[in-house]
A protein has these predicted regions:
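Short, structured segments at the rim of ligand-binding sites
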Residues: 1-446
């Protein structure tokens, strides 16, 4: 198990470019299964979760070719013209798919194109209960039969003669009980080649979902309502290949903003596509962090101090996650850690997952003033850089908490060690190398 050793207290300086969006990559890579033609995807991040998904596709017979545009940008060519559906039943597929929560999004495209799919109960971050009902209830409403036994889901829309030529997948009206991003993506892909029109109400409208719909339309799908929570998908008989480029990862953008503030550093975040960042810059500005837009770049100047705003009636600032266009839950951990060295107090409310704030005990060990109110809420009393955090040894519990701990370690006095950094590698590309280029003292210990 690898670790990071970080000597904190160094101010950082320079430019950094966010990787391709992880959450978008997982969706659009699954979508290559919808066609037998070549699909080219640019700006694919070199991270564990994405690489595991690509390995899963190769395991079921998808042809994959990778080229490097430069040392940090990859382009992949996929062709799913010889998919081996029986490989879904193999122990190897079950083992690999279980380790990746994104594997659930294989179901939608396989169901749409081949009429059936099998996937094990997926894993992923241990951040609380993350149910899959939204996915499977929607598929059942479209005519599929879903069974769960021996820790795997079997979904079939085949007619009784068992041939994919007689699929019973029908367009229908779907009112989702939650605006699930992966659930929305799965149902969109399932609906692209269903018979008739599917309407999805309360659809997730994150930029990732917009990008997926945009790509599918280039492939020949007929999707209306892109970017809204009401989607109309008219099923087509066949989809074609296309070229698609991933957005910059907005979670990395937010992480770098928090890192710059905590380490009192000046950093330019390049090519962020500001129009897709939503409330992210605004929320960090509420913490007192200066975020300047320069064209399509964000510049975070070095600040000796930054002060958390209060609401207009004088009450304590409250930052909570919400479905898009609200503040993304993936940045709640970063907002929390950025508040540690601010002046003032803030209530952080993680509404969507009940275990994502449990990492704060490690920050308290480092000297942070945090009160964990309950599994969903924590109050941060800022230190205003009057006291530095101290280096400690800790373990990364999940992707986002791991990076929050890394940011804290970069700002701390002394040496910190973070174990289980495979969690960080799941979502952040070559993060140690990129931080060293900014002046961080960080090394990987295998």
């Amino acid at each position: 198990m690898a670790s990071f050793e970080i000597k904190g207290g160094h101010r950082l300086h320079g430019e950094i470019t966010p990787q391709g969006a992880k959450n978008e990559a997982l969706q659009v890579i699954c979508a290559v299964l919808l066609t037998n033609e070549k699909v080219v995807i640019e700006n694919v991040p070199d991270i564990r979760d994405v690489n595991k998904l690509i390995e899963l596709l190769m395991l079921i017979g998808v042809k994959v070719k990778c080229t490097y545009q430069d040392e940090n940008e990859r382009t992949f060519e996929f062709q799913a013209d010889q998919v081996n559906m029986e490989a879904l039943r193999s122990p190897e597929f079950a083992t690999q798919a279980t380790a990746l929560r994104g594997s659930i999004m294989l179901v939608g495209p396989l169901l749409s194109r081949f009429g059936w799919a099998i996937v094990p109960q997926p894993g992923g971050d241990k951040i609380g209960r993350r149910r899959l009902d939204t996915h499977f209830i929607g598929m059942e409403q479209m005519g599929a039969k879903v069974t769960y036994h021996y820790s795997r889901y079997e979904v079939s829309a085949l007619s009784e003669d068992g041939t994919s030529k007689h699929k019973n997948l029908k367009g229908t009206y779907l009112l989702l009980d939650e605006a699930s991003v992966t659930g929305t993506a799965n149902l969109i892909m399932a609906a692209t080649m269903a018979e008739g029109e599917t309407t999805i109400m309360n659809a997730a409208c994150e930029p990732y979902v917009y990008q997926l719909c945009h790509m599918l339309n280039h492939m020949g799908a007929q999707i209306r309502g892109l970017g809204s929570n009401l989607l109309h998908i008219h099923g087509v008989r066949k989809l074609r290949g296309c070229n698609h480029r991933l957005l910059p990862d907005m979670i990395e953008v937010g992480s770098f903003i928090g890192m710059a503030a905590m380490t009192q550093s000046d950093i330019t975040i390049k090519n962020v596509q500001v129009e897709h960042l939503g409330l992210i810059p605004q929320v960090f500005r509420r913490l007192g962090i200066e975020v300047w837009q320069q064209g399509d770049d964000l510049f975070i100047p070095a600040q000796e101090h930054y002060k958390i705003e209060r609401f207009m009636d004088g009450s304590i600032m409250h930052i909570a996650d919400a479905p898009w266009p609200g503040f993304t839950p993936d940045l709640i951990s970063i907002a929390l850690v950025a508040a540690i060295q601010a002046k003032g107090s803030v209530l952080i409310h993680q509404k969507m997952f009940e275990s994502r704030l449990f990492f704060v005990d490690k920050l308290i060990d480092m000297g942070a003033q945090i009160i964990l109110c309950d599994p969903h809420r924590a109050t941060v009393i800022g230190l205003d850089h009057e006291h530095a955090l101290r280096g400690v040894r800790m373990t990364s519990p999940d992707i986002r908490a791991g990076v929050a701990l890394l940011i804290a370690a970069l700002s701390a006095n002394g040496v910190s060690r973070i174990d289980n950094i495979e969690q960080i590698d799941r979502g952040y590309q070559h993060i140690d190398e990129r931080l060293r280029a900014l002046g961080a003292d960080i090394r990987r210990i295998e």
